[in-house]
UniProtKB/Swiss-Prot annotation:
The keyword Nucleotide-binding applies. The lineage of its organism: Bacteria, Pseudomonadati, Pseudomonadota, Alphaproteobacteria, Rickettsiales. This is Thymidylate kinase. Its EC number is 2.7.4.9. HAMAP family: Thymidylate_kinase. ATP binds at residues 14-21. Keywords: ATP-binding, Kinase, Nucleotide biosynthesis, Nucleotide-binding, Transferase. Transmembrane segments: none annotated. SUPFAM superfamilies: P-loop containing nucleoside triphosphate hydrolases (SSF52540).
Length: 206
């Protein structure tokens, strides 16, 4: 029996260049083909206001706390206007990044920042966490090769190996901290179709 039920909130996490957005799209298209109500969204972004905040966040050098608060403000708008209404209507919601990305990208820049991110979410956001998170585990050296082949970039794309290793280690740590929620998909040696099949298998869709 499928693990999916109406109003399930699924997030995909990991560093840059790991094929995360591709997997979001593939799962979305598959669920649509099965006539399962589903929406696909992303963070930072997902609403008109949040997308404008995204442009500032990914293309502007901000102070670490300013960057964190920008991400949290965008999330509040996204949750209230899009994610929660979609879940209440019975949709599966697939989100490309959520709170774990904030912890790793913004939290790491602040003292006790990872704990701060989750505390802010608990205190300021509507009471919602993902039901399931897929961490797409791709080694940093492979991810950087993929990033370098891109035509477009933002400030996170152009940082060095040390940065990507820190992000990778952060996601690995979160997967151990939240094992009941985060499923690790080891994808360094797999093509997108193989990763997609593993995700479907975990969801009991095949």
């Amino acid at each position: 029996m499928s693990k999916l039920k109406q109003g399930t909130f699924i997030t995909f996490e990991g560093g840059e260049g790991i094929g995360k957005s591709t997997q979001c799209q593939m799962l979305y298209e598959y669920l649509k083909s099965q006539n399962i109500p589903v929406i696909l969204t992303r963070e930072v972004g997902g609403t008109n206001v949040a997308e404008k905040m995204r442009e500032i966040l990914v293309h502007t050098d901000l102070l670490p706390m300013s960057e964190l608060l920008q991400a949290m403000a965008a999330r509040y708008d996204h949750m209230v206007k899009k994610i929660i209404p979609a879940l209440q209507a019975g949709n599966i919601v697939i989100c490309d990044r959520f709170i774990d990305s904030t912890a790793c990208y913004q939290g790491l820049e602040l003292e006790n920042g990872i704990e701060l991110v989750y505390n802010l979410h608990k205190d300021l956001m509507p009471p919602l966490m993902p039901d399931l998170t897929f961490f797409i585990d791709v080694e940093s050296s492979i991810a950087i090769e993929r990033i370098n082949s891109r035509n477009m970039s933002n400030k996170f794309d152009v940082r060095g190996l040390d940065f990507y290793n820190k992000i990778y280690d952060c996601f690995k740590g979160l997967s151990k901290k939240f094992p009941e929620r985060i499923v690790t998909i080891k994808a360094s040696d797999l093509n997108p179709e193989q990763v997609h099949e593993l995700i479907k298998k975990h969801l009991n869709l095949i």
